[in-house]
């Protein structure tokens, strides 16, 4: 019953997030699977090309993302930076690994400024190794350049949820 309530709260948050950012915005995708919220944001909404400095436009979206995370103090949010497969280097950043991690930490700093508890945040860079689509065209490369926010139960709570579900399934 508690999980059902949590799920309905999560769904309410997600639908309000979709409404506030504009459900038809192709640069933002929001999904909920088994109590985990996935928010994927195109890099063109967050950063200028090759940069890890968060744009002013992004801050409105990040305010809403911060609310989703702050409303779930028992959850963690992993911020994953993703790039396309084009080699990248600009003197400061060595490659796509650097760019993906720097983008993740830039988003984390913004979320922290917006009041999210830093102990809930995890920085992750995926470079170009988890593409949504192949990197053959400019359009596809643009789809692969994104930041994904994964809001999930803390690992010990996650195991507790699984254990409870297993007990329910076995009729204990």
Where do the protein language model's features map onto the residues?
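Short Gly/Ser/Thr- and Asp/Glu-enriched loop/turn motifs at secondary-structure junctions
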Residues: 32-36
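Short, aliphatic-rich beta-strand segments
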Residues: 37-43
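A broad detector of the eukaryotic-type serine/threonine protein kinase catalytic domain
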Residues: 4, 44-46
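Periplasmic OmpA-like peptidoglycan-binding domain that tethers envelope proteins to the cell wall
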Residues: 46-64, 68, 72, 82-171
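Extracellular/lumenal/periplasmic "stalk" regions immediately C-terminal to a signal peptide or transmembrane helix
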Residues: 1-31
């Amino acid at each position: 019953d508690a999980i059902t309530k949590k799920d309905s709260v999560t769904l309410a948050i997600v639908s309000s997030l979709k409404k506030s950012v504009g459900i038809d915005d192709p640069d933002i995708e929001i999904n909920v699977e088994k109590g985990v919220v996935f928010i994927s944001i195109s890099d063109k909404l967050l950063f200028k090309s090759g940069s890890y400095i968060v744009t002013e436009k992004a801050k409105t979206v990040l305010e809403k993302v911060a609310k989703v995370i702050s409303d779930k103090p028992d959850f963690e949010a992993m911020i994953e930076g993703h790039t396309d497969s084009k080699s990248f280097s600009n003197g400061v950043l060595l490659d796509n690994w650097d760019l993906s991690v720097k983008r993740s930490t830039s988003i984390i700093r913004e979320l922290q400024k917006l009041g999210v508890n830093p102990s809930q945040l995890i920085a992750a860079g995926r470079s170009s190794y988890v593409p949504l689509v192949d990197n053959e065209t400019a359009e596809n490369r643009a789809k692969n350049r994104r930041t994904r926010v994964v809001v999930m139960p803390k690992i010990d709570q996650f195991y507790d949820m699984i254990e409870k579900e297993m007990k329910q399934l076995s009729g204990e």
